[in-house]
From Swiss-Prot:
Keywords: Repressor, Stress response, Transcription, Transcription regulation. It comes from the Bacteria. Belongs to the HrcA family. GO terms for biological process: negative regulation of DNA-templated transcription. This is Heat-inducible transcription repressor HrcA. It holds the Pfam family HrcA. One of its GO terms (molecular function) is DNA binding. InterPro entries: GAF-like_dom_sf, HrcA, HrcA_C, WH-like_DNA-bd_sf, WH_DNA-bd_sf, WHTH_transcript_rep_HrcA_IDD. PANTHER family: HEAT-INDUCIBLE TRANSCRIPTION REPRESSOR HRCA. The keyword Transcription applies. It comes from Lachnoclostridium phytofermentans (strain ATCC 700394 / DSM 18823 / ISDg) (Clostridium phytofermentans).
Length: 345
C-alpha cells in the first residue's frame, strides 16, 4: 500500500523527532512538530495505520512509537534531504601523516569516527582485475629459478620453480623476452591455449619451463590478498542507550575486532540506496547478527581502474543519515583528489 501525503508527513515527523531525541514519539509531539493542523485523535488514528502497515512500532514500556526497520528504509530511500555538512577539510589532515597507504587508511578511519561520532572501518585496496604488468625470471641455483610477477596495482608475487637442468644467461634472457612479449597487460582469462602454444614454440626446447612459469602466473593472479581492516571509534557506539546493553555491547565490540565478520559485512552488495556508491543497511539487512540493532553505511573508494576498497560507518538505527551520507560524499571527493594526483605523478 502506498502511503498518502498525510501519512508520509506524520511518519517523517516521527522518524526525525526520534532521530533527534531517542525517545518514543506520541501524537501530541507530532501535532506540535508538523504543520498539518490535525487533532491528536486524528494523528493517533494515522499512527495506528502506520503501525499496522509495519512502519512504526510501540516499545513495551512506552505509549509513544518509534520507527521500524521498514520505516527507516522508506525514510532513507525517499525522505532524506540533501545536507551540506560543514566537515573540516580532511585532505590536508589525511596527507599530513600519510607516507604510505596503510597510514592513510588509518587516518581515514580515525577522522570519520571523530566527525560522525560513530564506529568506522576501512578495508585495504582489493583488485577486481589482475593483469600482468611485468615478469622477470632469474636463476636461484642450478635446480631452481625465481619468477617475479608484478601485477596491476604494483602487487609483487615471487614464485620459486624447480627446473630439470640449469639455464644459462642467454636462455634466461630469451625466456624473459618471450614471457613479457606475450603476457604483459593480460589477465588470467586472456591466457588461452593458442597463446600458450605460441609461447612454447618461441621457447623451443625450454617449453616445459614456460608451462611451469604459466602455472605460477595463474596462481599469482588467482591468489586472494590478505585484506586489512582498520577500525576506529568502537566505543562511540556505547554512547547510545539502545546499544549499551552489556550483552549486546560486548557482542558488538567483539564483532568490530573480528576480521572475518567485518569482511563479510563490507563485501555485502545487497542493498538499495544507490547514492554515489553509498549503501545503507538497516537492522536485519546487515549480514552480521550482532549488528541487527545497528545501521551500517558503506562507500567504495577507487585508487585506479580495478583497484578499490570499502569504507563503513556503524551506529544506531537512529543515526543521522543525512550527515553520514554527506560526510562520506565529502570524503570520497577528497580521496579521489588524493589518488588522482598520486596516479598523475
Amino acid at each position: 500500500m502506498q502511503l498518502d501525503d498525510r501519512k508520509l508527513k506524520i511518519l517523517q515527523a516521527i522518524i526525525r523527532n526520534y532521530l533527534e531525541t531517542g525517545e518514543p514519539v506520541g501524537s501530541r509531539t507530532i501535532s506540535k512538530y508538523t504543520d498539518l493542523n490535525l487533532s491528536s485523535a486524528t494523528i493517533r488514528n494515522e499512527m495506528s495505520d502506520l503501525e499496522e502497515l509495519g512502519y512504526i512500532i510501540q516499545p513495551h514500556t512506552s505509549a509513544g512509537r518509534i520507527p521500524s526497520d521498514k520505516g527507516y528504509r522508506l525514510y532513507v530511500d525517499t525522505m532524506m534531504e540533501d545536507k551540506v555538512t560543514e566537515v573540516e577539510n580532511m585532505r590536508d589532515m589525511l596527507l599530513e601523516k600519510a607516507d604510505k597507504m596503510e597510514t592513510l587508511l588509518q587516518q581515514v578511519a580515525r577522522l570519520l569516527a571523530v566527525n560522525t561520532n560513530y564506529a568506522t572501518m576501512v578495508t585495504s585496496p582489493q583488485y577486481r582485475s589482475r593483469k600482468v604488468k611485468f615478469l622477470q625470471v632469474s636463476e636461484v641455483d642450478t635446480t631452481q629459478i625465481l619468477t617475479i610477477i608484478v601485477l596491476e596495482g604494483n602487487i609483487v608475487k615471487n614464485k620459486i620453480i624447480a627446473i630439470a637442468e640449469p639455464l644459462d644467461k642467454e636462455t634466461l634472457l630469451k625466456l624473459n623476452i618471450v614471457l613479457n612479449t606475450f603476457l604483459q597487460g593480460l589477465d588470467l582469462s586472456e591466457i588461452n591455449l593458442a597463446l600458450i602454444r605460441q609461447m612454447k614454440e618461441q621457447a623451443a626446447e625450454h617449453s616445459s619451463v614456460v608451462s611451469d612459469i604459466l602455472d605460477a602466473v595463474a596462481q599469482a593472479i588467482s591468489e586472494e590478498d590478505d585484506i586489512q581492516i582498520f577500525t576506529s571509534g568502537a566505543t562511540n557506539i556505547l554512547k547510545y542507550p539502545e546499544l549499551n546493553d552489556m550483552e549486546k555491547a560486548s557482542e558488538l565490540l567483539y564483532t568490530l575486532e573480528e576480521k572475518k565478520q567485518l569482511t563479510n559485512l563490507m563485501n555485502n552488495e545487497v542493498s538499495s540506496g544507490e547514492n554515489r556508491g553509498i549503501q545503507v543497511y538497516i537492522g536485519n539487512e546487515t549480514p552480521v547478527d550482532s549488528m541487527k540493532d545497528c545501521a551500517v553505511v558503506t562507500a567504495t573508494y577507487q585508487i585506479e581502474e580495478g583497484v578499490y576498497g570499502k569504507i563503513g560507518i556503524i551506529g544506531p538505527k537512529r543515526m543521522d543519515y543525512e550527515k553520514v551520507v554527506s560526510t562520506l560524499q565529502n570524503l570520497m571527493c577528497q580521496l579521489d583528489d588524493i589518488f588522482k594526483k598520486d596516479n598523475d605523478r
